[in-house]
């Protein structure tokens, strides 16, 4: 369609005249946000967040924005029959879970006492009519359930479920249905344990810390795997998807961890000169006092030492002490180029005592890098909506060096998959904004100009007998089964002529119709808190307001599209999943900012050329910037199709692949043959030629076809590269030629992806700056001279079969 031209002020054109594409800037969440607190749980209630867990001693920390936790209140004291006479007290409050249900706040946590007298490792349950307590245990004579890490999830039909960890097959995740009074409605059912010979078993058999949400009709469980100790450095977060709350299993797991340590890209992308300095594999013995290594070439960039030690290990490189006086390190240290020699180099380790331990050591030749403490062991997740109600945020513990604290990072959904923008620190490159605040917050909508697409969150006070909300021509009242004596939390999403309402997480109005021309809003009852934010969240067939476009099961059909939606704004986020059923052609994308037909910013995908195109039209004159969409990514085998004989690596959409990188160093994740000492490098097996032991195949429809390849230099001694003619595929298969060769090296590979049929475009505008992301990679930034309101929209040239499978848009108000 042809978009209507509007009269503009000259200032608007001047603003667009200043558009330019530049390198991506940086604005970071400042992790950690709460120091010294480990396994914790978080609840959002009436515009505030409450956090409790390890080292809170029965207290809650309180925040308005997830970043500042300046208030602390005492809410609970451990006092029951089964902990009396032991050392278990408030110091044994672990892994809080805080839920509001039926007019009560429910606090569940693990008592985690491992004493010389006895072990007390159980889950207990306490309640309070108010969030600030005091919480009292429901039963003092017995515990609630076994064993650790509880989480209560309320499904949209009101059914409650308890997720927990039992010590069965290692640490194993179980689920159990509950009644509304928190009594049990059935037996516990095992969900899954850690999968042998995957990233989940780099040391111990651990699956723990479950946290479940439902979003866009799918259930997502985040969990931890591997040992939590930073000495191992293997603790990571994974995700499992399911179609039902008790249907989580190995087949629903993402093959990859969604959050890992920031040491991982260091090792993946850089050569360790201590191990590979002369081009051959020379494992490091961390127990040695003298480590000798050869370097057969000059340093190209700058040397950096990754050093992890505790208990006072003084480390010297060629006689120069790099950590003088330090009792503990887990950091990246810049090294003077002059200290690194061509030929033999010597590292000496002087240990202060018998408990001094060298945990990790590597020397990289890198371009300029951020130095300082490293981030690792992300774990014990809680997932909450952000202050504006649209965003999802992960609250989790992680180590900054050896200190464990609370961190936050943004969650996005990319191609339907849950993705975490982390692990981040203040030094992480790129754009990682703090949580957005609601456009309006208070106890009423007085003075608010309501649009036709928004989120309204209302917390009604207890004993408010007339709780109801009217949206346009629809009035939603409190269901009869919900008590008006209790306060209730409402979530109302209006999208043009579609209305969706949840009360206490229960879906009471499921994408029902509302008069699109009636913007009236009325809130009845005593309001404790209310927030309002423009935006919409669309998926499936639930699209509205896109003039001339229709939706089917694949989403919004774009065809030939040139269409805007919504009011103008100056700060906003727009995320669109674009699915191309004909990935060899088409030009499609989004309007990142539209003033009129002569002044706009458009970001599109050119499928034939596999490029991201950023167009800047100013007074009718267009300049263009192009960025390749090709990328190299770590790729883990899908356990649904893999075993010790063969590995299959799947793609979520048709993907053009032209090379594979194979790790020469086996991971040491065979739990039946591994010594669980920390000094694993000397145990790992190195294979110079991995490819010759494997037959490679690509999936063509439902037929596996053999890949004819050649080997090339990879630029990294730990990776062997094979290249081949590009194939468009949904999967790769690697089969061991020798049945006794179990393919431990290929527990992960790297794949060279030239283009994928599905791409998640995300536009994040903050006033004068527009950040452009494709599949969570920031590829460009557009700068405007002035802060002029603009529309957003969708575009397609009509030459490809393209759907917008989901669209999330909301106006951003930045924290003050």
Predicted feature descriptions by range:
Residues 26-44, 67-99, 132-154, 181-211, ...:
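Surface loop/turn signatures of beta-propeller and other carbohydrate-active proteins
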Residues 631-708, 713-755, 809:
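Aromatic, loop-rich ligand-recognition surfaces of beta-strand-rich domains
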Residues 301-315, 347, 469, 492-494, ...:
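Aromatic-lined ligand-binding clefts that engage carbohydrates, nucleic acids, or primary amines
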Residues 354-363, 527-530, 673, 740-753, ...:
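Edge beta-strands of jelly-roll/beta-sandwich modules across compartments, strongly enriched
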Residues 348-355, 398-399, 735-742, 795-799:
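Short beta-strand-plus-loop segments that form exposed binding edges in beta-rich domains
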Residues 27, 268, 280, 368-369, ...:
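Extracellular glycan-recognition regions
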Residues 38-57, 94-115, 137-140, 149-176, ...:
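Hydrophobic core segments of beta-strands in well-ordered, beta-rich domains
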Residues 285-288, 295-298, 308-366, 483-485, ...:
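Beta-strand-rich ligand-recognition modules
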């Amino acid at each position: 369609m042809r978009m209507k031209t509007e009269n503009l002020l000259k200032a608007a054109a001047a603003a667009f005249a200043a558009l330019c594409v530049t390198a991506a800037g940086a604005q970071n969440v400042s992790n950690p946000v709460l120091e010294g607190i480990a396994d914790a749980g978080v609840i959002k209630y009436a515009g505030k967040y409450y956090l409790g867990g390890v080292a809170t001693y029965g207290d809650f920390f309180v925040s308005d924005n997830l970043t500042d936790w300046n208030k602390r209140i005492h809410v609970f004291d451990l006092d029951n029959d089964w902990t009396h006479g032991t050392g278990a007290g408030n110091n044994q409050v672990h892994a809080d879970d805080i839920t509001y249900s039926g007019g009560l706040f429910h606090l569940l946590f693990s008592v985690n006492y491992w004493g010389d007298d006895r072990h007390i490792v159980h889950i207990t349950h306490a309640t309070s009519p108010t969030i600030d307590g005091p919480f009292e245990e429901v039963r003092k004579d017995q515990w609630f359930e076994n064993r650790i890490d509880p989480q209560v999830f309320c499904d949209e039909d009101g059914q409650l479920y308890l997720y927990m960890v039992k010590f069965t097959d290692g640490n194993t995740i179980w689920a159990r249905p509950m009644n509304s009074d928190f009594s049990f409605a059935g037996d516990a059912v095992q969900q899954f344990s850690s999968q042998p010979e995957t990233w989940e078993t780099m040391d111990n058999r651990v699956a723990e810390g479950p946290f479940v949400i439902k979003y866009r009709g799918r259930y997502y469980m985040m969990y931890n795997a591997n040992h939590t100790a930073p000495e191992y450095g293997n603790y990571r977060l994974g995700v499992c998807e399911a179609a039902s709350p008790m249907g989580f299993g190995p087949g629903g797991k993402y093959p990859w961890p969604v959050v890992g340590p920031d040491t991982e890209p260091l090792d993946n992308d850089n050569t360790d000169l201590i191990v590979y300095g002369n081009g051959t594999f020379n494992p490091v013995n961390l127990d040695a006092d003298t480590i000798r290594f050869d370097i057969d070439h000059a340093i190209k960039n700058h040397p950096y030492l990754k050093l992890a030690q505790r208990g006072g290990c003084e480390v010297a490189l060629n006689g120069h002490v790099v950590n003088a006086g330090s009792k503990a390190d887990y950091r990246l240290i810049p090294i003077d180029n002059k200290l690194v020699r061509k030929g033999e180099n010597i590292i000496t380790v002087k240990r202060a005592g018998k408990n001094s331990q060298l945990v990790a050591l590597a020397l990289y030749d890198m371009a300029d890098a951020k130095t300082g403490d490293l981030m690792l062991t992300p774990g014990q997740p809680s997932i909450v909506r952000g202050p504006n109600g649209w965003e999802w945020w992960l609250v989790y513990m992680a180590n900054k060096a050896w200190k464990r604290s609370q961190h936050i990072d943004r969650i996005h959904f990319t191609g339907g998959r849950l993705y975490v923008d982390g692990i981040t620190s203040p030094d992480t490159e790129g754009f990682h904004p703090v949580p957005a605040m609601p456009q309006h917050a208070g106890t009423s909508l007085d003075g608010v100009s309501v649009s036709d697409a928004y989120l309204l969150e209302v917390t009604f006070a207890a004993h408010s007998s007339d709780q109801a909300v009217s949206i346009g021509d629809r009035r939603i009242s409190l269901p009869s089964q919900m008590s008006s004596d209790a306060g209730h939390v409402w979530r109302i999403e209006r999208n043009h002529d579609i209305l969706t309402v949840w009360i206490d997480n229960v879906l009471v109005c499921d994408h029902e119709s509302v008069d699109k021309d009636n913007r009236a809003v009325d809130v009845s009852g005593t309001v404790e808190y209310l927030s309002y934010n423009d935006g919409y969240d669309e998926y499936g067939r639930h699209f509205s307001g896109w003039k001339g476009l229709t939706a089917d099961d694949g989403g919004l059909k774009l065809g030939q599209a040139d269409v805007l939606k919504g009011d103008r704004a100056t700060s906003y986020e727009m995320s669109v999943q674009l699915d191309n059923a004909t990935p060899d052609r088409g030009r499609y994308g989004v309007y990142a900012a539209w003033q009129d037909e002569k002044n706009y910013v458009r970001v599109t995908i050119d499928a034939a050329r596999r490029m991201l195109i950023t167009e800047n039209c100013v007074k009718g004159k267009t300049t263009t910037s192009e960025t390749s969409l090709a990328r190299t990514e770590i790729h883990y085998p899908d356990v649904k199709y893999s075993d010790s004989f063969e590995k299959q690596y799947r793609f979520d959409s048709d993907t053009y692949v032209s090379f594979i990188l194979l790790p020469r160093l086996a991971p040491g994740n065979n739990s039946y043959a591994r010594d669980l000492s920390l000094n694993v490098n000397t145990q790992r097996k190195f294979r110079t030629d991995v490819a010759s032991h494997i037959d490679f195949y690509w999936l063509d429809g439902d037929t596996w076809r053999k890949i004819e390849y050649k080997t090339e230099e990879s630029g990294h001694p730990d990776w062997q590269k094979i290249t081949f003619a590009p194939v468009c595929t949904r999967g790769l298969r690697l089969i061991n030629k020798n049945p006794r060769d179990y393919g431990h090296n290929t527990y992960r590979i790297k794949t060279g992806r030239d283009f994928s049929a599905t791409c998640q475009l995300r536009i994040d505008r903050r006033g004068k700056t527009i950040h452009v992301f494709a599949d969570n990679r920031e590829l460009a930034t557009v700068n405007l001279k002035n802060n002029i309101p603009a529309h957003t929209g969708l575009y397609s040239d009509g030459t490809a079969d393209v759907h917008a499978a989901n669209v999330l848009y909301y106006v951003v108000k930045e924290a003050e």
